[in-house]
Regions:
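Short, glycine-/aromatic-enriched active-site segment of Class I SAM-dependent methyltransferases
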Residues: 132-154, 160-163
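Short N-terminal helix/helix-N-cap motif within the alpha/beta-hydrolase-1
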Residues: 55, 111-115, 144
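Conserved S-adenosyl-L-methionine
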Residues: 170-180
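Conserved N-terminal segment of class I S-adenosyl-L-methionine
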Residues: 1-94, 100-104, 119, 230-233
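Short catalytic micro-motifs in class I SAM-dependent methyltransferases
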Residues: 105-109
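A C-terminal cap/extension of S-adenosyl-L-methionine-dependent methyltransferases
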Residues: 182-247
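A short glycine-rich, Lys/Arg-flanked "PGG" loop and its adjoining helix->strand segment in the class I
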Residues: 116-131
Length: 247
């Protein structure tokens, strides 16, 4: 992600319908599938961007953000969130340092050479019994100009994501498509409408109340009704005990 993309993200992240809905989805998944989580929770946001979601995660406990880009770190630290310059595939923390690691729309970036290596590294710094909250863009058919604007180079099918998580050692969780109601509008827009040099965030803002309502409707069903398609994949996975570690 370059400086222009970070500027746009910082400008819209707090109130844009996409990020508001994404935070609601994340909260729903955590509350539904991890009610017994530690309180407070030690949280690492691996790929914090400009910090809107990182600051939101502080409701669960103490949170630290990491990102390799100076613009991201500056924006996140301005929110009062501790930050460290690092990449998801080389985290400067001891084994088992966190109860929850979040990585939201990160491992699809060009900067991430191996999603599986990053998922393994996130598992290393998560305590046994801790969780990973992961979101990635879904379905290669939806690839479009916005992906290129944010330097996204991969989209995942559900089976592919489950395989990556399994091979990285994550177990016993929930993973599935989200934003099914956005699938057709997104496909049509990316196939028929002229490309936007600044990605999708600005040009979809005018429909914010409609799209937010669509996503909030789906959020009520999250974890109850499996969706066959969606524009994103969301997962909450458990880190099983490492060999030789206590249960």
């Amino acid at each position: 992600v370059d400086t222009e993309a970070y500027k746009q993200l910082r400008r819209v992240e707090d109130n844009h319908w996409w990020y508001r809905a994404a935070r609601e989805q994340a909260g729903r998944l955590i509350d539904r599938f991890w009610p017994s989580r530690p309180r407070p929770t030690r949280v690492l946001d691996a790929g914090c961007g400009t910090g809107g979601t990182t600051a939101w995660l502080a409701r669960y406990g103490s949170v630290i953000g990491i990102d390799p880009h100076p613009d991201a770190l500056l924006a996140t630290s301005a929110r009062g969130v501790p930050v460290v310059r690092a990449s998801a595939d080389a985290l400067p923390f001891r084994d088992g340092s966190f109860d929850l690691v979040t990585s939201l729309d990160v491992i699809y970036h060009a900067r991430v050479q191996s999603p599986q290596a990053s998922l393994r590294e996130m598992r290393r710094v998560t305590r046994a019994g801790g969780r990973l909250l992961l979101r990635v863009p879904a379905l290669p058919i939806l690839e479009g100009p916005h992906d290129r604007f944010v330097h996204g180079v991969r989209r995942f099918r559900l089976g592919e994501l489950r395989r990556e998580l399994r091979l990285a050692g994550w177990r016993a969780g929930w993973a599935g498509y989200v934003n099914a109601l956005l699938f057709l509008p997104t496909l049509i827009a990316r196939r028929l409408l002229p490309s936007s040099a600044g990605g999708d965030l600005d040009r979809t803002a005018r429909f914010g109340s409609v799209f937010l309502g669509m996503q909030q409707l789906e959020t009520r069903l999250l974890g109850r009704v499996p969706l066959p398609i969606g524009t994103s994949l969301l997962a909450l996975m458990e880190n099983p005990p490492h060999p030789g570690s206590p249960e």
